Swiss-Prot record:
InterPro entries named in the record: AdoMetDC_fam_prok, S-AdoMet_deCO2ase_bac, S-AdoMet_deCO2ase_core
Active site: 111, 116, 139
Top-rank taxon: Bacteria
Family that this chain belongs to: Belongs to the prokaryotic AdoMetDC family. Type 2 subfamily.
Gene: speD
Record's protein name: S-adenosylmethionine decarboxylase proenzyme
GO biological process, one term: spermidine biosynthetic process
Enzyme Commission number(s) of this protein: 4.1.1.50
Protein's job: Catalyzes the decarboxylation of S-adenosylmethionine to S-adenosylmethioninamine (dcAdoMet), the propylamine donor required for the synthesis of the polyamines spermine and spermidine from the diamine putrescine.
Subunit structure: Heterooctamer of four alpha and four beta chains arranged as a tetramer of alpha/beta heterodimers.
PANTHER family: S-ADENOSYLMETHIONINE DECARBOXYLASE PROENZYME
Cellular component, GO annotation: cytosol
Pathway(s) served: Amine and polyamine biosynthesis; S-adenosylmethioninamine biosynthesis; S-adenosylmethioninamine from S-adenosyl-L-methionine: step 1/1
C-alpha cells in the first residue's frame, strides 16, 4: 500500500474510525447432551477474562492507553467486555485551583473497544453456532485496522464479516476538510495474503461514503473440524454426507445473509 502524504492539521484529528469484526464458529452435535457440552466448552474458552486479555492486546497494538475496563460473564452463557481507551497517556487531573495541564486534551480522543459473545443452536438440526462481535472505535490518529490480523488469529473463525467506516472530518491548516486520512480500497488490503488464501471473500464498498464491507468464508472443509466429541469415522457414509450438507448450508446462510432450501 502507498503511504498517504502527511498533512498538517488545524487542531485535533477528530475523525472517528470504526471497525466491526463478527466471527462465527460452527459445530455439529448429535445429542442435546453433546450440544450442552459444546456450549459449555465454548463459553469457557471465550470467557470474560480471556476476552479482556485479547482486548488489552488490541489496545496495545493500536497504540492506545487503557482508561477503564468493564467485564461480565453471563448465565446461562455469553460474555461481554467494554474498554475505554485513549490515544494519549492517562493523566490525573490535579484538584488544585489553576489552569489544567495541556495533556488533559486526551479527553477529546476517547475511543472504545467492546466484545460480546452469542452461543446459540438450531432446535432440531444439531447445528450449534458461536458468534463473537468485536467493535474497535477510535478517534484521532489511532487506526483500528492495525489490530485486524491479530483478531483474525485470535478467533480462527469459519465465517468472518468485517465492516470499517470513517466518520466526521478534520481540517488542514488552510481550513480544507479531510473526510479520511489514509488510503484504503478494501479491508482486504489489511489482511495478510496467507489468510486471504484460506477464505472466499466478497467486498461491498461505498467509497464516496467511506464504508467498507468484507465477508469471508473458509475454503477448506474437513468434517472432523466440525464434529464435537467424536470423529467422522464414527458416522456412516449417509450420516457423514447429511451432516456435511447441514454444516455447509449453515455456513452459506451466514455468509450470504439469507435462508436457503433444505436439500437433506
Amino acid at each position: 500500500m502507498n503511504e498517504t502524504p502527511r498533512v498538517k492539521l488545524h487542531g485535533f484529528n477528530n475523525l472517528t474510525k470504526s471497525l466491526s469484526f463478527n466471527m462465527y464458529d460452527i459445530c455439529y452435535t448429535k445429542t442435546a447432551k453433546e450440544r450442552e457440552a459444546y456450549i459449555e466448552y465454548i463459553d469457557d474458552v471465550y470467557n470474560a477474562e480471556r476476552l479482556t486479555n485479547i482486548l488489552k492486546r488490541v489496545a496495545d497494538m493500536i497504540g492506545a492507553h487503557v482508561l477503564n475496563i468493564a467485564k461480565q460473564d453471563y448465565v446461562p452463557q455469553g460474555a461481554s467486555v467494554a474498554m475505554l481507551v485513549s490515544e494519549g497517556p492517562v493523566v490525573e487531573v490535579p484538584e488544585d485551583d489553576g489552569p489544567l495541564p495541556e495533556a488533559v486534551v486526551l479527553s477529546l480522543d476517547k475511543s472504545h473497544i467492546t466484545v460480546h459473545t452469542y452461543p446459540e443452536y438450531h432446535p432440531n438440526d444439531g447445528i450449534s453456532t458461536f458468534r463473537a462481535d468485536i467493535d474497535v472505535v477510535t478517534c484521532g490518529e489511532i487506526s483500528p485496522l492495525k489490530a485486524l490480523d491479530y483478531l483474525i488469529h485470535s478467533f480462527d473463525a469459519d465465517i468472518m464479516i468485517i465492516d470499517y467506516r470513517v466518520r466526521g472530518f478534520t481540517r488542514d491548516i488552510h481550513g480544507y476538510k479531510l473526510f479520511i486520512d489514509h488510503d484504503i480500497t478494501s479491508i482486504q488490503d489489511y489482511i495478510p495474503e496467507h489468510i486471504r488464501e484460506k477464505y472466499d471473500m466478497i467486498d461491498v464498498n461505498i467509497y464516496q461514503e467511506n464504508i467498507f464491507h468484507t465477508k469471508c468464508k473458509l475454503k477448506q472443509f474437513d468434517l472432523d473440524n466440525y464434529l464435537f466429541g467424536y470423529a467422522k469415522e464414527d458416522l456412516s457414509e449417509q450420516e457423514a454426507n447429511e451432516t456435511t450438507a447441514k454444516l455447509r448450508r449453515e455456513m452459506d446462510e451466514i455468509f450470504y445473509g439469507k435462508n436457503m432450501p433444505n436439500t437433506v
